[in-house]
Amino acid sequence: MAASASASALQAERCLLVGVGAGPRRHRLPLRMPPPLHAPPALLLLPHRRRRRWPPAVRASPGEGGGGGGGGGGGGGLAGALEKRPVMSALTVVVMNMRVLEIGVVAWSLATAIIPAVAGFMPGLVLSRILVGIGEGVSPSAATDLIARSIPVQERSRAVAVVFGGLSFGSVLGLLFAPPIIQNLGWESVFYIFGLLGIIWCLGFQSLKEQQLRGNEDIQVIQDLGQSPSGSSDLISSSVSPKSSESSLGELMNSLKDVPWREFFKSKAVWAMIYAHFCGSWGHYTCLSWLPTFFSEELDLNLTEAAWVSVLPPLGSMIITSIAAPFADNLISNGVDTTKVRKICQTIAFLSPATFMMLSSVDLGVPPWEIVAFLTSGLALSSFALSGLYCTHQDISREYASILLGITNTVGAVPGIVGVALTGYLLDTTHSWSISLFAPSIFFYLTGTAVWLAFASSEPQEFSKSEPESS
């Protein structure tokens, strides 16, 4: 439930700002759409992901500073999360990840709830967005670490799909329920409600954690008696350990020093994940930020129609994810090499949107609803990445999965700032959707596919820290 309410809050923000699009074309805000995006119910409130942020700034005319400002205003929350992710992800390896997840959800839930109170006070508003960025920066990595340590590889795709699929579900809920809530209770109520949902989730999660800790103690008693139960008790112990929850600050700092950062960047597989995450995020953020404007301007849909069309990609993602995850797990269970499965899924996730964007960027003389169907299908099929890239961090290292996600997620946040702004600038300069929106995304999808097929690997890697050479 946690990821869903945060994704829903993003939709609420978008609903509040949708009326701005009624002005002249060059001063219109891109109508926001949620990440499909990014712990099972927790990420129902979190946009992965991703990453709730205000809609990009208005595309300025050349005399007002150029279109480059088109996305600059959207980077506040992203920038806050971006610079915190690698270090915050490292914390999840040392401090009990359930506790980190709770802290993250509490942080951005409270930060969301106080937005109405600080809306007219810029420093307070900026602080709230920073808190949202910090809270969201740790949540996906904490969830990833829990999956890596407690879910076997044959079930990993479904676990990731359930966790990160909450983002799409939350986006759909937000688009459906935010407008009537705003209409009947006022815009402030949306932020109060979604903040409260996060706190309620934390209370329920605390109860669940205590139950698991008690169960873990029972397992330990059985093991001490020499009656080790069959199954994955070792995995449970590694993810739910009272000792890990009591890590001191000194242990935390020492553990951060022990993280083999240099070894990460010596791995071709890690670099493949970094570039793939960047490429996927470029297409994701730029398309989902600007497609509603494209629907409105290029396909002559009115604002209401464009807003309703925006629910289709996350809805399609939910459907595709429910198919892709069992497909990947079944292949692995039947003996297909894990690396091959991850490459197949990620290739589908990249080539599908690239193909449909190519079809949408040329004049085929098809009606608008077919263009909408093309783009919706492509973006929905990109959810195969949850069984590709998003499982690979855990495949190659259970111990450092959360940090690896933090690294790739940091790079993946850059297109949300740079790509959205660049799209606005190119659109003002060229007046071409094909050049400004589709061509860059197609380029990154194709090059991302090539790099992924060449260098990606799901083989477990030992990232032992290199000893300094003695003089």
UniProtKB/Swiss-Prot annotation:
<feature type="transmembrane region" description="Helical">
    <location>
        <begin position="62"/>
        <end position="82"/>
    </location>
</feature>
<keyword id="KW-1133">Transmembrane helix</keyword>
<keyword id="KW-0150">Chloroplast</keyword>
<keyword id="KW-0809">Transit peptide</keyword>
<feature type="transmembrane region" description="Helical">
    <location>
        <begin position="403"/>
        <end position="423"/>
    </location>
</feature>
<feature type="region of interest" description="Disordered">
    <location>
        <begin position="226"/>
        <end position="247"/>
    </location>
</feature>
<comment type="similarity">
    <text>Belongs to the major facilitator superfamily. Sodium/anion cotransporter (TC 2.A.1.14) family.</text>
</comment>
<feature type="transmembrane region" description="Helical">
    <location>
        <begin position="270"/>
        <end position="290"/>
    </location>
</feature>
<protein>
    <recommendedName>
        <fullName>Probable anion transporter 5, chloroplastic</fullName>
    </recommendedName>
</protein>
<dbReference type="InterPro" id="IPR020846">
    <property type="entry name" value="MFS_dom"/>
</dbReference>
<dbReference type="GO" id="GO:0022857">
    <property type="term" value="F:transmembrane transporter activity"/>
</dbReference>
<dbReference type="InterPro" id="IPR050382">
    <property type="entry name" value="MFS_Na/Anion_cotransporter"/>
</dbReference>
<keyword id="KW-0406">Ion transport</keyword>
<keyword id="KW-0472">Membrane</keyword>
<feature type="compositionally biased region" description="Low complexity">
    <location>
        <begin position="228"/>
        <end position="247"/>
    </location>
</feature>
<keyword id="KW-0813">Transport</keyword>
<feature type="region of interest" description="Disordered">
    <location>
        <begin position="56"/>
        <end position="76"/>
    </location>
</feature>
<feature type="transmembrane region" description="Helical">
    <location>
        <begin position="162"/>
        <end position="182"/>
    </location>
</feature>
<dbReference type="Pfam" id="PF07690">
    <property type="entry name" value="MFS_1"/>
</dbReference>
<feature type="transmembrane region" description="Helical">
    <location>
        <begin position="348"/>
        <end position="368"/>
    </location>
</feature>
<dbReference type="GO" id="GO:0031969">
    <property type="term" value="C:chloroplast membrane"/>
</dbReference>
<feature type="transmembrane region" description="Helical">
    <location>
        <begin position="371"/>
        <end position="391"/>
    </location>
</feature>
<feature type="transmembrane region" description="Helical">
    <location>
        <begin position="185"/>
        <end position="205"/>
    </location>
</feature>
<keyword id="KW-0934">Plastid</keyword>
<dbReference type="GO" id="GO:0006811">
    <property type="term" value="P:monoatomic ion transport"/>
</dbReference>
<dbReference type="InterPro" id="IPR011701">
    <property type="entry name" value="MFS"/>
</dbReference>
<comment type="function">
    <text>Probable anion transporter.</text>
</comment>
<feature type="compositionally biased region" description="Gly residues">
    <location>
        <begin position="63"/>
        <end position="76"/>
    </location>
</feature>
<dbReference type="InterPro" id="IPR036259">
    <property type="entry name" value="MFS_trans_sf"/>
</dbReference>
<feature type="transmembrane region" description="Helical">
    <location>
        <begin position="307"/>
        <end position="327"/>
    </location>
</feature>
<keyword id="KW-0812">Transmembrane</keyword>
<feature type="transit peptide" description="Chloroplast">
    <location>
        <begin position="1"/>
        <end position="59"/>
    </location>
</feature>
<feature type="transmembrane region" description="Helical">
    <location>
        <begin position="435"/>
        <end position="455"/>
    </location>
</feature>
<feature type="transmembrane region" description="Helical">
    <location>
        <begin position="103"/>
        <end position="123"/>
    </location>
</feature>
